[in-house]
A protein has these predicted regions:
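A residue-level marker of the well-folded mature domains of exported/periplasmic proteins
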Residues: 9, 18-154
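Bacterial N-terminal signal peptides
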Residues: 2-14
């Protein structure tokens, strides 16, 4: 999944690379500082930004607090970046800040968590990710078909 997100972000930036030089994008994730999974994403956006001549800033709530994440999205939008990339870790908590960014004319791309329908309802340009419920359900069906009676889906 992380490779898919990195590729999608790279392609998104590459699509407008001629006009992107000097632009600033902010990626806001829900991950606490202790979540090392996001290091792949941090490295990918840094490399994509360097390659395309754009600034890409990674921001997150240090403890994973979603109210803090909402404030980070608001602060990011107030800085008027050329785009915001964000997770939808909790639709109800993040709905307002994301919609305000869109109303300011800031393009938003939703990644990783949430659903395509939620992203659309918030005004995001696109959703790149795998809805957790659908992924878990699909894994359960495959396990059932394979005769597995107990497993842990992470």
């Amino acid at each position: 999944m992380s490779g898919a997100i990195a590729i999608a972000l790279g392609l998104t930036f590459a699509a407008g690379s001629v006009q992107a030089a000097g632009e600033k994008y902010i990626l806001v994730s829900h991950a606490p500082d202790s979540d090392s999974w996001w290091n792949t994403i941090k490295n990918a956006i840094r490399e994509a930004g360097d390659h395309l001549g754009v600034e890409v800033v990674y921001r997150n709530p240090p403890t994973g607090d979603l109210a803090d994440m909402a404030r980070i999205i608001e602060q990011s939008a107030a800085s008027r970046p050329d785009g915001i990339i964000t997770t939808i870790a909790d639709y109800d908590v993040l709905k307002g800040p994301i919609q305000k960014a869109v109303k300011r004319g800031i393009p938003v791309i939703a990644i990783n968590s949430g659903t395509p329908d939620q992203a659309r309802s918030l005004g995001a340009l696109m959703y790149v990710g795998q809805p957790e419920y659908d992924a878990g359900y699909g894994a359960g069906m495959k396990a059932k078909d394979a005769g597995v009676t107990k497993f842990l889906c992470v």
